[in-house]
């Protein structure tokens, strides 16, 4: 018996919707990253993007434990001298509510071209509305 290796023609992708309201950021991100990678499927193949599409709604109502709203700092650098910018989580969620979920999930998928393809299948929305009703997404419990 030959070992099964998935390829683009054998993969069947599904759409899932996740409600982030009241969910802890890291616990939500691990489940979403696993679905994006395709690890929830018995046909998972490491070198093929076999994951499904994930829609995250209510990202602005995500929960952080402890004092992380003040203590968790996100860094970015412009490339110039003294170009380091520090932004606490509570300021980042006001500027761009979807950024917390996107950054958490992006850190949990491979940092390669395959990982970029996986990340393109993630859609994060701040509120309860999304524009993917035509894909008939299934609810995914976290």
Curated annotation (Swiss-Prot):
UniProt xrefs under InterPro entries: Ribosomal_uL13, Ribosomal_uL13_bac-type, Ribosomal_uL13_CS, Ribosomal_uL13_sf
SUPFAM superfamilies per UniProt: Ribosomal protein L13
Protein name, per record: Large ribosomal subunit protein uL13
Job of this protein: This protein is one of the early assembly proteins of the 50S ribosomal subunit, although it is not seen to bind rRNA by itself. It is important during the early stages of 50S assembly.
Gene Ontology MF term list: mRNA binding; structural constituent of ribosome
Entry superkingdom: Bacteria
Organism encoding this protein: Acholeplasma laidlawii (strain PG-8A)
Family named by the database record: Belongs to the universal ribosomal protein uL13 family.
Keywords: Ribonucleoprotein, Ribosomal protein
GO biological-process terms attached to the record: negative regulation of translation; translation
Summary of subunit composition and partner proteins: Part of the 50S ribosomal subunit.
Ribosomal protein recorded as keyword: yes
Gene Ontology CC terms: cytosolic large ribosomal subunit
